[in-house]
Amino acid sequence: MPRIVLITGASSGYGKATAKAFKENGDTVIMTARNLEKLNSACSEVGGDLAFSMDVTNPSDWDLAVKSVKEKYGRLDVLVNNAGGGVAIKEVSEFTTEEIDATIKLNLNSVIYGCRAFADMMKEQKCGTMINISSVCARQCWPTWSVYAAAKAGVLNFSKGMYLEMQPHNVRVSCVVPSSASTGFQSACGIGSTADQLLPEDIAETVLYIANLPQRAVVEDVTVWGIDKQVNPL
């Protein structure tokens, strides 16, 4: 039976590539993002089954997502918390309070909200997989990336704690930690590209691999580097 998969930030980058990978795997794919026009275009391109606009930083939107999934499908098998972004990449002293709050909300709070929203459903099912997308900034940091790195480190450690809470219910929680890849986020941050760097499809394959493991097996976290990287992924 096809799995029901929900992916946030699915209009581009990792999210869009992940939606395509699950769809090609024969799963039923729900795609969400803020920009409905871009989302609908991406959904048509990859053959997604359902698309709806949502703000992952708004808990009420998560409540509506749970309601929609429950009414249409009755369950959720895989949740991919992919939505995120830099908001601002600069020295901490240059951040406004609003930019700090926005960075933490988009990259950390959104993941917590998503896992909280679908936790009860997956507990009742006694199965399910939550996959949260972090960043290598969770493991090491560089000047101007401090606030973003703090949020992504939070995602990594939140995922570890969430797994311990969900494990007794046969629900898996994993964290994927990607290096820089060829996405819109990279371009917006002014990061150069190389022929050997990661592609969104590489992260999508990693996410799909984790989800395809037998329910008895769980990947706690996995870091994916491009072969062109050594110590500094940027």
Question: Where do the protein language model's features map onto the residues?
Answer:
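The beta1-alpha1 cofactor-binding region of Rossmann-like NAD(H)/NADP(H)-dependent oxidoreductases
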Residues: 54-64, 97
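Substrate-binding pocket helix/loop in short-chain dehydrogenase/reductase
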Residues: 90-92, 99-104
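Conserved glycine-rich cofactor-binding loop
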Residues: 11-12
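Residue(s) in the substrate-gating loop at a strand-loop-helix junction
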Residues: 135
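Active-site helix of classical SDR
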Residues: 115, 151
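Conserved glycine-rich Rossmann-like NAD(P)H-binding loop of the short-chain dehydrogenase/reductase
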Residues: 25-41
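C-terminal helical subdomain
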Residues: 168-171, 175-176, 183, 192-232
